[in-house]
Regions:
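Conserved helicase ATPase core of P-loop NTP-dependent helicases/translocases
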Residues: 251-254, 260, 413, 420-470
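Walker A/P-loop
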Residues: 196-217
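A conserved SF2-helicase RecA2
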Residues: 144, 345-359, 372-375, 489-495, ...
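Conserved helix-turn-beta segment of the N-terminal RecA-like "Helicase ATP-binding" lobe
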Residues: 231-258
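Conserved interdomain hinge at the start of the Helicase C-terminal
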Residues: 380-417, 423-428
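Conserved RecA-like P-loop NTPase helicase motor core
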Residues: 440-536
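Post-DEXD/H (motif II) to motif III coupling segment of the RecA-like Helicase ATP-binding lobe
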Residues: 293-294, 301-364, 534
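Extended alpha-helical interface modules used as scaffolds for assembling large macromolecular complexes
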Residues: 1-169
Length: 557
């Protein structure tokens, strides 16, 4: 027995003692391959899953490094069966390979003949495989490349896709590094992606994922299709590309609800591509409009389910996924792995914070006590109405105002999910002399950009954001975020929202992230679920009582 911070159990759970002096080093060592499940104050629970281990394997970690991390930090002897299982699971990745044979086109090759025989017999692969070419090789129908990888993953034999890519139409793109240069982790991320050909780069919000995309485009130097969550995010990409690369206005097209331009670099929204009319998707021609050399998926964890179907047909194109988290609330992480590609690079948030590239943040949960009248109404509410009732309680209003006052001149974002609640907050703050305009889905793109520009210029002190606030909005000076309601217990949303205040501040200021929840309700339970992802990245939540916030004097402004 050693005095390590980790307890490794035979059911593949790992318990990490948070207060141990080596806890941070241990968390960083296990983060590439273990998934955080629960994160109460003193003991965090991680789990080893096949997908987590395969992602680690594809990102360059071998079984030896995983086993070494477990042995190095474990307090008690690690069950031998678990170590064997880790090695065998990781060894499954790449025992089957997809290759491009000069004579036969796409083929599935088995480095282990028995595995090839086993999967070839599976009924799930019916119609995907062609003739057996030799003892180790089976022909694959070219159109089934994506679907085959999905099925092989489900069978427990994830194939390594080495079949290569079409070069696409060449188009010169170069970075214009005048007065700035790629940070070391951005350059590393691009190198890992280029070596793998396709896959996902995981970086914190605010760490410059767009620049990783731009550098990958420069490396590939071919026509590029960039898929984004909404028009505002698309225009942000456009601004960055014009500022940081040799691309000109005429070379970048926008394919959104408002415009339908196809240019050498085209930025399209997920929404437009997944629009259905009479059961068909009329805008899918974008994928065939040019001979794309690279497809970039921004915020890949939010990729709508129909996009996976389209992506299955794009396996001959280089694909780069960018995200702050591989967590998907719909459990489709396996489809991201099979169809976009495995994780190629992952930088822990705290690492990048320690290098000064994102602002240090403290996270606080403020618990509000509902008045008796509301508690009775909550108790009597239907189960499906309970969260909305608790999340939108009026008791939160004075707390929001007090939090804004607590931070004097700092710029504040108030973020929520229910429009009615956000309008109530806006009216309340207005009456209290704190004007805070609302940006929501119905706000026109023009008005949205006007408000964001005013906020960036310091003319607005507070902004209220609906779900729009979760995606790719560049408001670097926001130092305080107050979250009042969300999508039930969504961890990915929590990560996005913290990312809004993590842009490094010019004077090295701390960022503050508050979640206001109703005590003794489902609101508190959901908050605990949402915090898991950030706990995994090393952020601790402090829990305070609303009365403490309401009774403290406001900061000097």
């Amino acid at each position: 027995m050693t005095n390590g911070p980790l307890i490794v159990q035979s059911d593949k759970t790992l318990l990490l003692e948070v207060d141990h002096p080596d806890a941070t080093a241990c968390r960083m060592a296990i983060a590439p391959f273990a998934e955080l499940e629960r994160s109460p104050e003193h003991m965090h629970t991680y789990r080893l899953t096949p997908l987590g281990l395969w992602n680690a394997r594809a990102a360059g970690h071998d079984a030896e490094s995983v086993v070494d991390a477990l042995l190095r930090f474990s307090r008690y002897p690690v069950p031998h069966s678990l170590l064997v299982d880790v090695a065998e699971t990781m060894d499954r990745y790449g025992r089957l390979q997809l290759l491009n044979d000069p004579a036969h086109g796409l083929v599935l090759r088995g480095l282990d003949r028995a595995v090839l025989v086993e999967v070839a017999k599976s009924k799930k692969l019916a119609g995907m495989l062609g003739a057996q070419l030799d003892a180790d090789t089976i022909a694959v129908h070219g159109s089934e490349r994506g679907h085959l990888k999905q099925v092989l993953l489900k069978l427990g034999w994830p194939a390594e896709d080495l079949a290569g890519y079409v070069d696409g139409e060449a188009h010169p793109i170069a970075l214009r590094e005048d007065g700035w240069h790629l940070r070391s982790y951005q350059r590393e991320a691009v190198e890992h992606f280029t070596a793998g050909g396709s896959g996902v780069v995981v970086l914190p919000c605010g760490a410059g994922k767009t620049l990783v995309g731009a550098a990958a485009m420069a490396d590939v130097s071919a026509t590029t299709l960039i898929l984004v969550t909404n028009t505002v995010a698309g225009r942000q990409w456009r601004r960055e590309l014009l500022a940081r690369t040799t691309l000109t206005e005429d070379e970048i097209g926008e394919y959104s609800g408002e415009r339908k331009e196809i240019r050498p670099v085209t930025i399209a929204t997920y929404q437009v591509l997944t629009t259905r009319r009479n059961g068909t998707f009329p805008h899918l021609n974008v994928f065939d409009a040019r001979d794309w050399g690279l497809i970039v998926y921004d915020e890949v964890h939010l990729l709508p389910a129909p996009m996976f179907r389209f992506t299955a047909d794009l396996q001959a194109r280089r694909r780069l996924g960018l995200t702050a988290t591989l967590v998907r609330e719909d459990g489709k992480e396996g489809d991201v792995f099979s169809l976009i590609g495995p994780k190629r690079y992952d930088a822990p948030w705290k690492d990048i914070e320690s290098q000064g590239w994102i602002a240090p943040a403290d996270c606080t949960e403020v618990r509000v006590t509902l008045p008796d009248r509301d508690r009775l109404a909550y108790a009597a509410a239907e189960p499906e109405e309970k969260y909305k009732f608790a999340a939108t309680a009026d008791a939160k209003l004075p707390v929001i105002k007090a939090l804004i006052e607590r931070h004097g001149d700092e710029q504040v974002l108030v973020i929520g999910a229910y429009l009615e609640q956000l309008h109530d907050i806006g009216r309340f703050l207005d009456e209290e002399g704190v004007p805070a305009p609302i940006v929501h889905g119905g706000t026109t793109t023009k008005e949205r950009e006007r408000l964001f520009d005013a906020f960036r210029a310091g003319e607005l002190r507070a902004l209220i954001l609906s779900k729009v606030g979760n995606f790719s909005i560049d408001l670097p000076e926001a130092a305080v975020a107050v979250q009042v309601s969300g999508t039930f217990g969504s961890r990915q949303e929590e990560a996005q929202r913290l990312g809004r205040v993590l842009r490094p501040k010019g004077d090295g200021r701390q960022a503050h992230f508050y979640t206001v929840v109703s005590r003794d309700t489902i609101d508190t339970e959901y908050a605990a679920h949402r915090q898991r992802f950030l706990a995994e990245q090393g952020y601790a939540y402090t829990i305070v009582d609303a009365d403490d916030v309401l009774t403290e004097p406001p900061a000097a402004g």
